[in-house]
Amino acid sequence: MKNYYGICEWSMPVSGPLAIRLAGTAGFDGMQLGEAGGRSLNFPLNHPEIQQIYNETARHYEIRLHSLNLGALLAEGTIDFPVNTPQGDAARASIRNGIRACRALDIRTLVITVSPKTEDAYSNALSHLEYACRLAEISQVEIAVESALPLPLIQVLLDRLKGRVKVCMDILNPLRFGTGDPIEQIQAFGTETISHFHMKDSLRSLFTPGQRGCVLLGTGDAGYIQTAETIKKIGFQGWMITENYYYLPPMNMNDDFMKLILKDFETLTSTFES
């Protein structure tokens, strides 16, 4: 096993094949894709011509389409609703179409974010994750759960799903949402449970839900260096995917977003290859 370095599509001010191309020219190994509009645009990633363009671009620029993030499940809140309701059925449709897109684009990991606020929402999210696991097992796709919940609630979720999901470990979310310590979570999950990492950094003044502003890795208050050392100590090797927002302040104040991306790429590789 070795380390691989990726970037989230939404970290850039552009998307689709252009984002894939820029990731390739920057030197990344792969990319985590968004849904290209998902349900709101009738699932464009399931269109054969669009799939062909994505696959051809990824091959040409030697970019692995590492994962697909179903961000709309969280943004729309549909994952918090029970099945046989319009919202719950919409969540199931997003999951089904996400799995289909993964198969067509040779994507091996589907990322689902869960952050329920009530017991009912928690139960509904668990039901949708169980549904996702059933489909994923048939299609040989890994389900990776990202969550800003406190560690005990995430562990209950993992226990209920009986090892059928892994964790997309975001090293900033526990601080930004005030739900825990990323180092403690990494140590608790260990290498067997973590699918991949979202790498990002920010300022303490931006440690509030809803904030997206970031700073270059290692220049903020999120303890990037200490967290990276913890990742090494547990023996993790795999995908490190930057989720910094390279077009938003305070990082980008009328700067060249590609220069910022290249700086973080250099930081990532020097951190984990030294």
Give each language-model segment a name:
Residues 41-64, 139-141:
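Short acidic, glycine/proline-enriched helix-loop-strand junctions
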Residues 38-48, 72-92, 116-124, 208-216, ...:
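Surface-exposed, active-site-proximal loop segments in enzymatic domains
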Residues 1-6, 67-80:
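N-terminal small/glycine-rich loop or linker at the start of catalytic domains
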Residues 1-5, 13-29, 106, 151-274:
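Histidine-acidic metal/acid-base catalytic patches
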Residues 18, 59-61, 75-166:
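Active-site acidic/histidine proton-transfer and metal-coordination neighborhood
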Residues 29-41:
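A short beta-strand-loop structural module common to alpha/beta enzyme folds
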Residues 46-52, 88, 92-95, 122-130, ...:
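Charged helix-capping and loop-helix junction motifs
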